[in-house]
Amino acid sequence: MISKINGKLFADMIIQGAQNLSNNADLVDSLNVYPVPDGDTGTNMNLTMTSGREEVENNLSKNIGELGKTFSKGLLMGARGNSGVILSQLFRGFCKNIESESEINSKLLAESFQAGVETAYKAVMKPVEGTILTVAKDAAQAAVEKANNTEDCIELMEYIIVKANESLENTPNLLAVLKEVGVVDSGGKGLLCVYEGFLKALKGEKVEAKVAKLDKDEFVHDEHDFHGVINTEDIIYGYCTEMMVRFGKNKKAFDEQEFRQDMSQFGDSLLVINDEEIVKVHVHTEYPGKVFNYGQQYGELIKLKVENMREQHREVIRKEQHTAKPKMETVETAIITISMGEGISEIFKSMGATHIISGGQTMNPSTEDIVKVIEQSKCKRAIILPNNKNILMASEQAASIVDAEAVVIPTKSIPQGISALFQYDVDATLEENKAQMADSVNNVKSGSLTYAVRDTKIDGVEIKKDAFMGLIEDKIVSSKSDQLTTVTELLNEMLAEDSEILTVIIGQDAEQAVTDNMINWIEEQNPDVEVEVHEGGQPIYQYFFSVE
């Protein structure tokens, strides 16, 4: 029985919850409704939770309130994608509810889950039932009722998991698209994985990391990032230190959590990877010898590597003196746009974007990524163009925590972003620009061509793995094995009698022959439509289209 949870136990709950989510990230990704090759939910929740875990591991406290603040900050700044932002808000409310406590009981644990739900619902403009929000809500409500009958946090957490699982299984009855595809909600599944890790920790158990067999001959490739380091003397830990230890039978038994905590005292940038035979370690430290001595407790040192990062930094400075490196532009009003593909970035720059953040379907930037750009620009005002529905909430979260006056234009595609930026008026106020840029989003129809990563049926369209898919906004309107056929079916749906301009943005995987045939088809079938073609260079999507 566990009647009280202190900071140490809560830290272990976070660590085990993060590990269980990490182990199941691919499974969560596989539940994504749309079979596009992004797999964002599991990936984004995992990266978000990992950010919270790392913050906790670097700032351990026996006081649960203090630890909660640390965890919440890590989640907030590391949040990626809508699922990651919602996860961060669930625990933001949870941690806010315990901030004045040194330890909590079952009743406060349940109330904190409920507080998290209330915070998350407020953070979402239009909450949708049948999602992670529903699973969190149902589990929290059940927890509050159960806490009246038990003081055992283990029993409470077991009940929460039962109710969360029941809620998860019911999500297809609340969201028609889940039932059509035959899956449960991916975000809800990710949250359940976190809760299951919590229970493991409460029971004194450990979630073992899923790892591939390690290569005994290679270290993890590491390129030192000296961004933000002005003087060599500012480098606190001067030696990039790596070691490989083969576990010994008569040596100390290896416990990954203990190993990580001990190693973190030697420096920063810690990376630990292990299997049954060896452990690989990467750490930046001032005393490599201490790292090696510690490693010998567990077995034989089979590979060692030390690099002097101060000397490397001096070399970087010497090279930079000969090669001018542009600094981040300081502006009054920063126009920050998320972009995927060099060509698309150049389009945004030519239209007046001051800062480009690389990101998109396969890697959503975190809240912190956006915050850093705003802060480093030293701007007074900021306009953020997410250009992806899954980056919208992280953008709004970033805008809410920076000192600059920041607004988010709700662009959900690259074409919408281009259309919005075209409306920017340098002489208008921030609010005027926000209104006219947001209004322009409604005047453009966006389309895209990509491929399917699995068999499914959605929006009434039968889809086969590796077939091409044509989408208008988020709706799949065509899917065929032939690329040109899929494109022409898509454009037939997009183009109307009053369509005037069709913009085509070509991706890095587009075939020239298909592009030529597509343009010829457009000119023959729609002679009154003006066609603009740009090289975008975007991955995943062979083409982006916009119709105005």
Curated annotation (Swiss-Prot):
Cited Gene3D superfamilies: 1.25.40.340
Transmembrane segments: none
Coiled coil start-end: none
Domain DhaL, first and last residues per copy: 8-200
Single Gene Ontology BP annotation: glycerol metabolic process
Molecular function GO labels: glycerone kinase activity
Name used for this protein in its record: Uncharacterized protein SAB1090
